[in-house]
Amino acid sequence: MSKPLCSTGLRWLWLVVVVLIIDLGSKYLILQNFALGDTVGLFPSLNLHYARNYGAAFSFLADSGGWQRWFFAGIAIGICVILLVMMYRSKATQKLNNIAYALIIGGALGNLFDRLWHGFVVDMIDFYVGNWHFATFNLADSAICIGAALIVLEGFLPKPTAKEQA
């Protein structure tokens, strides 16, 4: 017998939609208003900078001839499927894990869309200190990192007792 979807972690899928709208919206604005390589200072140590990433995090495998596009697309799809199954198997009340999974799925789908549509991921956030620049990233990357951090945080939190779970 199947359980009602709103009693599962899938209740948190609305957050995937929010992440996608914000991520794809920010990338659309960059594509419409910036030429490749353009930079606009926002705050000290923070720029908007249009960059294309043909690889993964930190441009890993960016110069590998194109096969990596499909490799990373497959990884994103696989991770999304696994996390959706985990959300279905978890209770809607397990907020921290489900929020984390939804953030990761939203970020993965945002970057997957870029890979499939453009052949690269649109990056635009340039954080720097002095002459040192962190790798340029986007809001999907941020959602994935926040989701991963929440999973780690959940591992350090005390587990609820049987009474608290009932």
Swiss-Prot record:
Xref: InterPro entries: Peptidase_A8 (IPR001872)
Residue ranges crossing the lipid bilayer per the database entry: 12-32, 70-90, 102-122, 137-157
Mode of membrane association: Multi-pass membrane protein
Involved pathway(s): Protein modification; lipoprotein biosynthesis (signal peptide cleavage)
Pfam families: Peptidase_A8
Gene Ontology BP annotations: proteolysis
Catalytic activity: Release of signal peptides from bacterial membrane prolipoproteins. Hydrolyzes -Xaa-Yaa-Zaa-|-(S,diacylglyceryl)Cys-, in which Xaa is hydrophobic (preferably Leu), and Yaa (Ala or Ser) and Zaa (Gly or Ala) have small, neutral side chains
UniProt entry keywords in alphabetical sequence: Aspartyl protease, Cell inner membrane, Cell membrane, Hydrolase, Membrane, Protease, Transmembrane, Transmembrane helix
GO terms assigned for molecular function: aspartic-type endopeptidase activity; endopeptidase activity
Similarity remark: Belongs to the peptidase A8 family.
Full protein name: Lipoprotein signal peptidase
Gene name of this polypeptide: lspA
